[in-house]
């Protein structure tokens, strides 16, 4: 869980920017999007192999 404390004399925009950066570094949004819906193990394997094939292509 990302936590950001607003510093003294810091604007809300700056604090929000720091919070967004910490959330993206932690991978919180990507993880929640990945776990939003149940995905069968067979579908996971298929997506994983397709991603590997795509990486190998380039």
From Swiss-Prot:
InterPro entries: Ribosomal_bS21, Ribosomal_bS21_CS, Ribosomal_bS21_sf
Region (Disordered): 37-58
Keyword Ribonucleoprotein found: yes
Keywords of the record: Ribonucleoprotein, Ribosomal protein
Family, similarity comment: Belongs to the bacterial ribosomal protein bS21 family.
UniProt KW Ribonucleoprotein keyword: yes
One Pfam family it belongs to: Ribosomal_S21
Biased composition (Basic residues): 43-58
Cellular component terms (Gene Ontology): ribonucleoprotein complex; ribosome
Gene Ontology molecular function terms on file: structural constituent of ribosome
PANTHER family per the UniProt record, alphabetical: MITOCHONDRIAL 28S RIBOSOMAL PROTEIN S21 (PTHR21109), SMALL RIBOSOMAL SUBUNIT PROTEIN BS21 (PTHR21109:SF22)
Name of the molecule in the record: Small ribosomal subunit protein bS21
GO biological process: translation
Coiled-coil stretches noted in the UniProt entry, renumbered to this chain: none
Provenance organism: Enterococcus faecalis (strain ATCC 700802 / V583)
SS bond partners: none
């Amino acid at each position: 869980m990302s936590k950001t404390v607003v510093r003294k004399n810091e604007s809300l925009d700056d604090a929000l920017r720091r919070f967004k950066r910490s959330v993206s570094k932690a991978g919180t949004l990507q993880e929640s999007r990945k776990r939003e819906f149940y995905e069968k193990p067979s579908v996971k394997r298929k997506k994983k192999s397709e991603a590997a094939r795509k990486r190998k292509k380039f």
